[in-house]
């Protein structure tokens, strides 16, 4: 029997099959273009669509986890409207004459690194938020939807990490628990887990995310921070 340890976000015991959640891989290429106006227009359209999605998530979260917890999706909308973020994307498109996808990815990485370097714990957590909004815009630019956990039976979700948008879209009746390799007890995802009363562990760094665990029966001990 394998035992993996992590930090408990919400106490409780869960027993069930593991479902490994793999995020949609973004196909990112650096493509030169002379049509910078067209790329700027694509970015603006994708950003508008992302803000609309975030508003829908806010309304869903408002009903299910309350105004205080739903506020993260308002924060995400504000981050997408942030002047510095948008100026960075637009500047990269115009000066480097490249596609919108690449500009968004570079901007997201740069801003995430900036937040991670800050001394304040709360501000460091914003690195995950800026990556989340950037991935949402990238998904739209690539013609898809941002990842969503889908299952037809109650399972223990195991993932590298879960964004707040992915967490709030979990169908509580279908999720016995979730376990992530990375994450922080101060993250919005952890806060949402507590509010949704889902037993959860984070920081289970030795847990594999492959077929060796997918579909296997497991026990999540949210009281002692262990998965067996």
Where are these regions (language model features)?
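Non-catalytic, soluble scaffold/interaction modules
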Residues: 1-228
């Amino acid at each position: 029997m394998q035992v993996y340890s992590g930090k408990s976000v919400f106490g409780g015991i869960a027993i069930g099959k593991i479902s490994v959640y793999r995020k949609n891989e973004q196909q990112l290429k650096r493509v030169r273009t002379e049509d910078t106006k067209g790329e700027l227009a694509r970015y603006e359209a994708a950003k508008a669509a992302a803000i609309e999605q975030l508003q829908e998530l806010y309304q869903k979260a408002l009903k299910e986890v309350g105004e205080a917890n739903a506020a993260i999706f308002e924060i995400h909308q504000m981050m997408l409207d942030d002047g510095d973020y948008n100026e960075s994307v637009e500047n990269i498109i115009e000066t480097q004459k490249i596609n919108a996808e690449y500009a968004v990815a570079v901007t997201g990485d740069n801003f995430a690194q900036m937040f991670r370097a800050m001394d304040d714990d709360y501000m460091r957590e914003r690195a995950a938020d800026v990556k989340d909004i950037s991935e949402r815009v990238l998904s739209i630019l690539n013609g898809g939807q941002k990842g969503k956990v889908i299952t037809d039976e109650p399972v223990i979700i195991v993932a590298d990490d879960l964004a707040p948008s992915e967490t709030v879209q979990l169908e509580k009746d279908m999720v016995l628990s979730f376990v992530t390799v990375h994450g922080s007890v101060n993250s919005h995802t952890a806060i949402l887990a507590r509010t949704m009363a889902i037993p959860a562990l984070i920081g289970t760094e030795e847990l594999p995310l492959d077929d060796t665990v997918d579909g296997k029966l497991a026990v999540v001990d949210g009281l002692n921070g262990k998965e067996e």
